[in-house]
């Protein structure tokens, strides 16, 4: 965020889609979206699309990506009906909560002149391919307060700014670190709090005595802590700030980027650089009605992202025994993936029931439509219990696996997944066991499948205080193949475990289960089930941790997950068809985490005498109020002929 960047700078420092034959060029896919900027129709009261376009006119077209945030408090008020939410104030509180005490106050020094929107953009550095250029823009609501802010910025304990006049625009630049001379190498941080960070630089500037140079000369090189590069260092070496002729404030880690932005508004057409507002790919995203509804919207260019592939692979070794983990293999795989797509966008908005987000990765060329699947969908949702921690549902694992196998021939990074799965059986059961995981297991999972984590007082882990258990349902058109595999696995496990694990038959309702059981230490002669499987119907296989937990699925649970209001709210406007749901009951999970955290905290603190230490702790009202607002969250993937789409819903109660 613009305000955050200014405060920190001055004071303290997409999943590939299932491949389909390619037919139509990208031009046909964006022809209806590449409407000239002047013809964009604006809907909605806040005109976020138009305000975004005004800032985009200052952005050079070679941007890697950008994020646009609406700072209008009334746009956020649906998140909290009791009062208008101010996102800038929230950011200031967030920094304070992390112990940041900046010399520049976001609320006092920046918010008074900050406009109603902020844009953050990322560029590759043309002078150094191992660096990003980070730039933020915002309209100026009060020129005098902006000038006062610049005056205060100059008064800080920072190197004296360099003033440059470019096309009659004054640019102030602070050089915080010396640029490296010679070959440009990827900048790697040696530890989390790098001495190269701006925060450390300021601390050293304030605390280092005047004879530091002499001390450094006398220091023993062997006493210097050896460090190993771990991750890329995005520390700020310099930053520049200016007010563009359009009245927009800009801060950037590269002065030349500000100059390019000035050139996008040059009076002479022959001197004017093309801006993002002229880019048809960006206009396609901007014309999406979701942009105008969004609190946060984003756009990115895969072609520009590919230019920094060497930066992304900077820490990888030249050679590796692990497939796909050498620098060359990684870059080749990354470039192949990026070539399949043209651009991406992101939208996040508020609904009466919670937060919604959507991300689209557009194919480089329009693909043939996915063959229509007439099979019944989401049947298993009616067989799952409603009281769950989380659930994953999808369909046709066999087809998904075949796609991964084909992609691994083009992308070496997928080889580790494919080969890893193929090695599972030898690693878990032994190399002498005759079982092909692809032919004997994956091949018959050709229908819907679901995995669910849920609470149960019959969990096999109940005696340890854990009520969590796991169950799975699998629809298949090849039950005979599944039975042959299950019989083979049962025989092998019985052989390996000797007399410790016993295989018994259990019955839950009308379903007969094969149960794997071990001696119950609590009662002599009894056994306890750890895993069970059986056929819920002729084509639905059920697997559970513990035979008794199967009662959650048999007979049809009432209410089922499909009937849960929280789940229905989460999936109500998700695209259909899709690849399945990844669902979390955030409310229940948050209660469990908070209770566990309170127990851990209470065990190390003084508990009031009136509270019974052996009883279940009562959460503070403030925490309960926050948790009670939480609902369910669901993540969904889908695909059309022109894009791969992901959707997210996060439930929030009023």
Identify the meaning behind each predicted range.
Residues 374, 385, 392-448, 454-463, ...:
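Hydrophilic extracytoplasmic domains
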Residues 1-18:
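Gram-negative bacterial Sec-dependent N-terminal signal peptides
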Residues 13-180, 297-300, 304, 356-460:
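Structural boundary/hinge residues at secondary-structure and domain interfaces
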Residues 39-45, 93-99, 108-114, 145-151, ...:
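Short linear motifs at secondary-structure transitions and domain/linker junctions
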Residues 67, 110-280, 442-569:
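Single conserved position on a long alpha-helix in the C-terminal lobe of the eukaryotic protein kinase
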Residues 82-86, 265-269, 312-317, 362-364, ...:
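Short secondary-structure boundary/capping segments
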């Amino acid at each position: 965020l613009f305000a955050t960047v200014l405060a920190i700078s001055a004071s303290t420092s997409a999943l590939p889609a299932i491949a389909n034959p390619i037919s139509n060029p990208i031009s046909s896919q964006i022809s209806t979206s590449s409407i000239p900027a002047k013809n964009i129709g604006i809907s909605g009261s806040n005109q976020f699309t138009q305000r975004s376009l005004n800032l985009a006119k200052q952005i050079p077209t070679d941007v890697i990506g950008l994020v646009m945030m609406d700072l209008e408090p009334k746009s956020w008020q649906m998140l909290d009906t009791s009062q208008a939410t101010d996102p800038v104030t929230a950011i200031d509180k967030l920094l304070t909560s992390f112990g940041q005490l900046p010399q520049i106050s976001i609320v006092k020094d920046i918010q008074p002149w900050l406009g109603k929107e902020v844009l953050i953009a990322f560029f590759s550095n043309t002078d150094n391919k191992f660096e990003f250029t980070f730039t933020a823009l915002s309209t100026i609501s009060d020129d005098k307060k902006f000038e006062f802010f610049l005056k205060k910025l100059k008064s800080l304990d920072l190197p004296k700014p360099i003033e440059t006049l470019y096309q009659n625009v004054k640019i102030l630049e602070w050089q915080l670190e010396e640029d490296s001379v010679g070959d440009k190498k990827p900048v790697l941080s040696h530890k989390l709090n790098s001495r190269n960070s701006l925060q450390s630089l300021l601390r050293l500037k304030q605390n280092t005595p005047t004879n530091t140079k002499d001390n450094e000369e006398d220091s023993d090189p062997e006493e210097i802590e050896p460090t190993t590069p771990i991750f890329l260092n995005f520390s700020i070496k310099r930053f520049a700030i200016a007010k563009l002729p359009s009245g927009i404030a800009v801060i950037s880690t590269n002065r030349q980027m500000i100059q390019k932005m000035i050139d996008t508004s040059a009076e002479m057409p022959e001197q004017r650089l093309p801006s993002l507002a002229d880019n048809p790919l960006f206009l396609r995203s901007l014309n999406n009605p979701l942009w105008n509804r969004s609190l946060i919207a984003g756009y990115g260019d895969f072609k520009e992202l590919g230019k920094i592939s060497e930066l992304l692979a900077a820490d990888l070794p030249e050679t590796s025994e692990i497939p796909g983990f050498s620098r060359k293999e990684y870059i080749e795989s990354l470039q192949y993936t990026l070539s399949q797509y043209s651009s991406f966008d992101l939208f996040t908005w508020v609904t009466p029931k919670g937060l919604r987000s959507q991300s689209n990765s557009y194919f480089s060329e329009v693909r043939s439509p996915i063959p229509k699947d007439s099979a019944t969908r989401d049947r298993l949702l009616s067989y799952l219990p409603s009281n769950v921690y989380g659930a994953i549902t999808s369909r046709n694992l066999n087809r998904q696996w075949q796609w991964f196998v084909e992609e691994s021939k083009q992308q070496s990074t997928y080889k580790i997944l494919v080969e890893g799965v193929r090695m599972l059986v030898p690693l878990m059961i032994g190399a002498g066991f005759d079982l092909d995981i692809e032919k004997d297991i994956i091949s018959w999972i050709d229908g819907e499948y679901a995995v669910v984590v849920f609470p149960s007082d019959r969990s096999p882990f109940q005696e340890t205080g854990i009520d969590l258990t796991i169950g799975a349902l699998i629809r298949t058109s090849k039950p005979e193949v599944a039975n042959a595999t299950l019989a083979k696995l049962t025989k092998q496990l019985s052989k390996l475990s000797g007399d410790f694990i016993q295989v018994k038959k259990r019955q839950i309702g009308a379903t007969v289960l094969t149960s794997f059981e071990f001696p119950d230490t609590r009662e002599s002669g009894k056994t306890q089930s750890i895993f069970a499987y059986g056929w819920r119907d002729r084509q639905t296989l059920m697997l559970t941790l513990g035979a008794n937990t199967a009662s959650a699925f048999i007979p049809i649970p009432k209410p089922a997950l499909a009937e849960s209001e929280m789940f229905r709210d989460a999936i109500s406007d998700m695209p259909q068809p899709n690849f399945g749901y990844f669902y979390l009951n955030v409310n229940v999970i948050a209660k469990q985490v908070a209770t566990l955290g309170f127990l851990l905290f209470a065990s190390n603190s003084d508990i009031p005498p009136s509270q019974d230490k052996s009883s279940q702790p009562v959460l503070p009202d403030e925490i309960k109020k926050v948790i009670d607002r939480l609902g369910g969250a669901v993540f969904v993937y889908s695909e059309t002929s022109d894009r791969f789409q992901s959707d997210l819903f996060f439930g929030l109660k009023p």
